[in-house]
Amino acid sequence: MTDTRAALPLVYSCSGCSSAAQLANHVALRLDRAGVAEMSCIAGVGGDVPSLVRTAHSGRPIIALDGCPLNCVQGCLSRHGIQAARHYQLQQYGVKKRRHEDFDPAQAQLVLDQVQADLAAHPLTAHEATAAPAPRMAA
């Protein structure tokens, strides 16, 4: 990891089998590839992998993307006493959880645009330790 990446917030996403989960994962990957955040592995945090738990505890601001109201990302983080600086629950953006279906790429782009706009309007700081609720935006 370069010093530039180390200065970025971490992003964790749901990556389950539903369309909503895969949309959340897609948005996290796009944030990572665009250099907005560095994606890390929520399964490793939930699975108590020491190096990944240390990364989550590094003090970097955390963006959590949950695909549905089960809030698995938030739950995995809270098991380790970690609270995301920004938590996006994608159902609030009109994302529907569908099994055995792919996500809608156009909807994924809209969600990505909304998350990026929120992060640009309300940048995360290095010392941000509490969750700021994500504003509701039109789907």
Feature-to-residue mapping (PLM):
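Iron-sulfur (Fe-S) cluster-binding modules
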Residues: M1-C41, S51, A56-P61, L70-A139
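S-adenosyl-L-methionine/SAH cofactor-binding core of RNA-modifying enzymes
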Residues: D48
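Short secondary-structure boundary segments
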Residues: D66-G67
